[in-house]
């Protein structure tokens, strides 16, 4: 994978502090920097799941709860986990505005989920796996809590494969996005970190191979919006 110049710091304390600092402006920046496409991508992830067994569904790295809300439109039993308490507070405010049953949010590190093995029907993560300190450990933990034949849907930023899109995308990612983030966020460094973390993240075939290595089957990837985002899906073995 084409990387940034230096490995990004993904220690739990660094990531937690960064996202807690940007929490008040996080939704505004998501809408602005994605041209409001982030909500559409989250719906795509929710719609990629069959949710056939009626078991609870968990969104990890849940942030301010938008993916959990997209899931709630598909199924009543939704959980949302994130280790940033300021992010979760915003998520809880959103959950309080919808009819019961509401998503249940709780503080947790994706690497150590406080859930029994084989307890979930599905698990999702949107734009969060590139922030974990140990990607393979996170995938193993996601696999652990899924029931047999349970599903996963993972959204992550990607580099467009087309040169026509890649060059303007990289210019925006490296030059414009960090400036906008710096103007609007008290922690502008989060938006310098973003392009570096994307460029160092395994993509497409490499990522689905990592999914298969921890036990997922039927691992597939699907480009969204010209390949700037990738949707990955898979299942736990029966």
Predicted regions, residues:
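N-terminal, positively charged/glycine-rich alpha-helical extensions of SAM-dependent methyltransferases
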Residues: 1-25, 173, 184
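C-terminal alpha-helical "lid/dimerization" subdomain adjacent to the S-adenosyl-L-methionine
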Residues: 13, 158-210, 220
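Conserved alpha-helix/loop element of class I SAM-dependent methyltransferases that forms part
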Residues: 25, 35-55
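Class I SAM-dependent methyltransferase SAM/SAH-binding core
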Residues: 56-112
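A short acidic, Gly/Pro-enriched loop at the edge of an enzyme's catalytic core
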Residues: 111-122
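A short SAM/SAH-binding and catalytic strip from SAM-dependent methyltransferases
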Residues: 121-135, 158
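A short glycine-rich, Lys/Arg-flanked "PGG" loop and its adjoining helix->strand segment in the class I
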Residues: 136-151
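Core SAM-dependent methyltransferase catalytic element
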Residues: 208, 214-238
């Amino acid at each position: 994978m084409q990387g940034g110049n230096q490995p990004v710091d993904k220690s739990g304390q660094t990531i937690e502090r960064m996202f807690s600092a940007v929490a008040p402006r996080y939704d505004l920046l998501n809408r602005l920097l994605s041209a409001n496409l982030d909500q559409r991508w989250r719906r795509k992830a929710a719609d990629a799941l069959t949710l056939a067994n009626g078991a609870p569904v968990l969104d990890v790295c849940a942030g301010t709860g938008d993916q959990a809300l997209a899931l709630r439109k598909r199924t009543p039993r939704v959980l949302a986990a994130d280790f940033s308490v300021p992010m979760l507070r915003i998520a809880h405010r959103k959950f309080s505005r919808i009819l019961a049953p509401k998503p249940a949010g709780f503080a947790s590190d994706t690497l150590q989920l406080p859930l029994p093995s084989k307890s979930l029907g599905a698990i999702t993560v949107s734009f969060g796996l590139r922030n974990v300190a140990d990607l393979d450990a996170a995938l193993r933990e996601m696999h652990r809590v899924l029931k047999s034949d349970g599903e996963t849907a993972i959204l992550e930023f990607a580099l467009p494969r087309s040169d026509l899109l890649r060059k303007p995308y990289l210019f925006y990612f490296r030059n414009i996005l960090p400036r906008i983030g710096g103007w609007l966020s008290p922690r502008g460094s989060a938006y310098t970190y973003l392009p570096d973390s994307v460029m160092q993240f395994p993509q497409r075939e490499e990522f689905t191979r990592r999914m298969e290595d921890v036990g997922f089957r039927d691992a597939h990837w699907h480009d969204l919006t010209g390949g700037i985002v990738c949707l990955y899906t898979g299942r736990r073995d029966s």
